[in-house]
């Protein structure tokens, strides 16, 4: 989601020898900023610091060996957009990130990530424009034999929570939760 706080976490990742994937929205890097940027943060219902990641911070994250992935341009629910707008949200974001990092961007994560926010047509589109993996927001353990690299589980990591809380979140199998309760594991 492109928050500056990601950059402040780099020393912790370095100290622990951890490499992470950061899925980035690109609206904060676009020349159009202004009120569109304010609406972006309001839409995310962000309650804390509203400082966006700068281009320099993004390059630092990338040069530290972390993976940069695409998360759309302005974090809209892509499933609610007509097909004609997918390029402006997805391909535009991919192009901006490739320009900023100087590297191919081959990983994508659907904004919001729950099943109602993406479709097989969106998944196919992302694959067709060159993404090698697609992350959902469906929590659960991801293992090499899980299978579909175009439906990877993604579990958030909350820096203000104890590590045990975050590890418990990683153990949740979102698919089992949905099957048992009939509800989404994340909202």
Predicted feature locations:
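Conserved beta-strand->loop/alpha-helix structural units within folded catalytic cores of enzymes
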Residues: 1, 6-9
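Metal-dependent polysaccharide deacetylase catalytic core of the NodB/CE4 family, i.e.
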Residues: 3-4, 14-116, 151-152
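C-terminal active-site subregion of NodB/CE4 polysaccharide deacetylases
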Residues: 3-4, 80-107, 112-187
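Alpha-helical segments flanking ligand/cofactor-binding loops in enzyme cores
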Residues: 11, 59, 123-124
């Amino acid at each position: 989601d492109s928050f500056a706080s990601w950059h402040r976490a780099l020393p912790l990742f370095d100290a622990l020898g951890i490499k992470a994937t950061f899925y980035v929205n690109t609206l904060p890097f676009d020349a159009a900023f202004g009120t569109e940027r304010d609406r972006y943060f309001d839409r995310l219902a962000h309650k804390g610091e509203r400082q966006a990641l700068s281009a320099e911070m993004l390059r630092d994250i990338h040069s530290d060996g972390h993976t940069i992935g695409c998360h759309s341009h302005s974090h809209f629910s892509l499933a609610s957009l007509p097909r004609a707008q997918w390029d402006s949200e997805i391909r535009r974001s991919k192009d901006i990130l490739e320009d900023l990092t100087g590297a191919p961007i081959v990983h994508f994560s659907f904004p919001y990530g729950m099943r109602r926010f993406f479709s097989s047509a969106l998944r196919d589109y992302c694959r067709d424009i060159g993404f090698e993996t697609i992350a959902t927001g469906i929590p659960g353990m991801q293992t090499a034999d899980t299978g579909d690299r175009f439906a990877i589980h993604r579990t958030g990591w909350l820096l203000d929570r104890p590590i045990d809380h975050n590890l418990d979140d990683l153990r949740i199998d979102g698919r089992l939760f949905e099957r048992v309760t009939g509800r989404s594991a994340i909202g």
